[in-house]
Amino acid sequence: MSPIGEPHSSTSKVRPAAAADRAWIAEFLHEHWGAAIVVVHGEVIEATQLPALVAEPRRGLASYRRLGDDAELVTLNAVPPSRGTGTALLEALTRQLGAEGCTRLWLTMTNGNLSALRFYLRRGFRLSQVRSGAVDQARRLKPSIPVIGEHGIPLHDELDLCRALGPDTPDGAAGPPWSRAHSDPSDGWWLSRAPVAGSDIAGSSDV
């Protein structure tokens, strides 16, 4: 994952992705994720099929999916980084989801994406759980997932983060939707065996 700096102010206009954006989204995902597929909590998804928000003029993308009353941020990227575009996308998405009645926004990231961890913790996310060895498992599905992350940190584990979208919403202590059907930590996975789509082990990079 690329480093994430603290953003400057942004005047980016954020809008829902349209059918005309499909080719650009595929190209953007290939540039930032190495493929149009992304992998997380043991599943592979065609990210171009997800709903998304676009920061004009096509300099940022946030893709997501609904999971009942919850939602998952799948990818978040901005070009160039550290200009506030990622923050603009994230805040636009949380406003939209809150207005739609969504209660929590989740994301998953690698243990070595320290810049992204700082970015999200400063924007209201809290750590919910760690899945030891989950990145090693995901690498079997997508071998291009890096072995080494920022600062030479080996990438082995997935971190789930949660942001409550309302003042009375529980903070996600029960774990993300994909883990609730199977929460035995003894196997190191802590995730549902039911098919669920997700992100490339990091709700974001380059924001």
Label every model-predicted segment.
Residues M1-A20, L159, L165-P195, D206-V207:
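Conserved N-terminal entry element of GNAT/NAT acetyltransferase domains
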Residues L50-A52, L155-D160:
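Short hydrophobic/aromatic beta-strand or adjacent loop that forms the aromatic wall/cage
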Residues P16-R83, T87-E91, Q96, A164-L165, ...:
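Acetyl-CoA-dependent GNAT
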Residues T87, G112-E150, L155:
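Conserved active-site alpha-helix within GNAT-family acetyltransferase domains
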Residues L97-N111, S115:
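Conserved GNAT acetyl-CoA-binding A-motif
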